[in-house]
Design a protein with these regions (language model features):
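Hinge/lid segment of periplasmic solute-binding proteins
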Residues: 3, 10, 14-40, 106-165, ...
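Short, polar/charged alpha-helical segment
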Residues: 4, 33-37, 54-73, 169, ...
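Short, solvent-exposed loop/beta-turn-alpha elements that line the ligand-binding surface or hinge
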Residues: 18, 25, 35-41, 122-137, ...
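Long, aromatic- and glycine/proline-rich binding clefts that accommodate carbohydrate-like moieties
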Residues: 21-40, 45, 317-324, 370-422, ...
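Extracytoplasmic "Venus flytrap"/periplasmic binding protein-like
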Residues: 61-141, 154, 174-175, 286, ...
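Extracytoplasmic/periplasmic substrate-recognition and gating elements
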Residues: 64, 69, 145-150, 169-170, ...
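Extracytoplasmic/periplasmic solute-binding protein
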Residues: 143-158, 162, 194-249, 292
Length: 457
């Protein structure tokens, strides 16, 4: 009797007793995602590492909501983009447990999964229905490795890509419109091609007025100039490798060379002064300061540009997608990150991290995430009229996410990136050599790395 009584109490307390003895019916994904188990004993807080930027602030607000609901404190620890990767991989090489989760760059998937840093989330994302709540492209880019394997290491958290902001008051000024048409023979409007982008950039470059055509990425740290250049490269028909992962003849193809020459021409003719080492902060600052007519940036940084307390031109700021290249191709560099669980933390902490992601992935919380300014990957939220009309840049974002491409995400991506950052910077900013020579060196070094690493098929 005593055994029966104690067993009955344990089973009831643990929620294992089913009403009427019947098996519980299968529940839809949203219902499965919203049923949070009690937190593992002793887990009072969770630590999430991310880069230092506005979306991390928004995630902290989401974390505060979680604390109100569960009592578990969520700390979003922010590290500047330039040192974010170094900090993370140094911690991982020591199998550190300072962080329970990381909102890691899409390019980290190969290295972090192959080296055992990330927890395999395939069963978790599948059994909860979370896998089916996000768009397929974001699941592929932010969660899956190897490509096409159906193995998932991250929850798509911050969808992102490069786009452009422009000064509507300049573009729509009747005098400017007349002068532009007189000079170039077509109407002044957001550019649809890189040739038009160059024309418009030249037209608005007026040093005597402290006005310049563009602010584009040039920074040597992390992946800035590589991301900026690949916006042009992909749209010009270039790529980092062919289907067999051969870089030679692809990175240094005529299409890629033409794209790099265009990127340097934009820098030489029309870049605002002081932007020889520019990334997202500097391009936004140049726009806010009234220095440029057009500014390249990730969509994640555009909320500041529509905030009149930050940007004096907020009411006159418009947005357009990355233009087409000469052959009609149109792509944009992928940004964005997925949320992954660190494999070195205890099983209890891993479960607590899963509980947080399960809660975060609910449609209602993803709607909150989007409302704060996070770029949700949730299919329902992205398709909602509420999202598309919530911000002036959201329609361009939704369009851009249909033609994104990314840099490498294989385990040696960091070595490949260092080569491209160095060579592109030396040519575009440093003025060393020709575009062909710069891309020849990248192609040669990349080819050797890919062959030595066994990645060439």
């Amino acid at each position: 009797d005593r055994i029966a009584e104690e067993h009955q109490k344990m089973l009831e307390d643990g929620g294992f007793v089913k009403e009427g003895g019947a098996m519980a019916e299968e529940k839809p994904a949203e219902a499965m995602m919203s049923e949070l188990p009690p937190p593992p004993e002793g887990i009072k807080e969770l630590n999430i590492l991310w880069a230092q930027w506005d979306p991390a602030d928004y995630l902290q607000e989401i974390g505060n909501m979680y604390e109100q609901e569960t009592g578990i404190k969520v700390n979003v620890i922010q590290e500047p983009w330039g040192s974010f990767g170094d900090l993370f991989f140094t911690e991982m090489s020591a199998q550190g447990t300072s962080y329970d989760m990381v909102v890691g760059d899409s390019q980290w998937l190969g290295q972090s999964s192959s080296q055992g840093h990330y927890l395999d989330m395939t069963d978790f994302l599948t059994s909860t229905g979370i896998k089916d709540s996000v768009t397929p492209a974001t699941l592929q880019y932010y969660g899956e490795y190897p490509p096409g394997s159906g193995t998932y290491w991250g929850y798509p958290t911050e969808g992102d890509a490069d786009g452009w902001a422009y000064r509507k008051d300049l573009f729509e000024n009747p005098d400017e419109m007349a002068a532009f048409k007189d000079k170039y023979g077509y109407d002044l409007a957001p550019p649809e091609t890189y040739a038009q982008l160059k024309d418009i950039a030249e037209f608005f470059t007026r040093p005597e007025e402290n006005l310049y055509g563009v602010a584009i990425y040039t920074q040597a740290d992390y992946d800035a100039i590589t991301m900026g250049f690949e916006n042009a490269m992909f749209s010009f028909g270039g790529n980092w490798a062919d289907a067999g992962n051969n870089a030679m003849g692809v990175v240094n193809s005529p299409e890629s060379v033409a794209a790099l020459e265009m990127y340097k021409e934009l820098y030489d003719c029309c870049q605002a002064p002081g932007l020889s080492n520019a990334f997202f902060v500097e391009t936004n600052d140049a726009f806010i300061g009234g220095q440029v007519a057009m500014s390249m940036n990730y969509f994640a940084f555009f909320p500041a540009l529509v905030n009149p307390e930050v940007n004096p031109y907020a009411a006159d700021t418009g947005f357009f997608v990355n233009p087409k290249g000469p052959g009609g191709d149109q792509y944009a560099a992928l940004g964005g990150q997925g949320m992954s669980i660190i494999s070195y933390i205890s099983p209890d902490r891993q479960q607590a991290a899963k509980d947080f992601i399960k809660w975060f992935a609910q449609d209602s919380i993803q709607q909150e995430w989007a409302a704060l300014g996070g770029y949700t990957c949730n299919s329902k939220v992205l398709q909602s009229e509420e999202f598309l009309s919530a911000a002036p840049f959201n329609p361009a974002f939704a369009e851009t996410m249909t033609f994104v491409k990314d840099f490498w995400n294989i385990p040696i991506y960091g070595e490949l990136l260092r080569v491209s950052q160095t060579e592109l910077g030396n040519y575009v900013v440093g003025g060393q050599g020709t575009a062909q020579e710069a891309l020849d060196r990248i192609a040669e070094e990349h080819q050797k790395m890919l062959e030595d690493g066994g990645f060439v098929k």
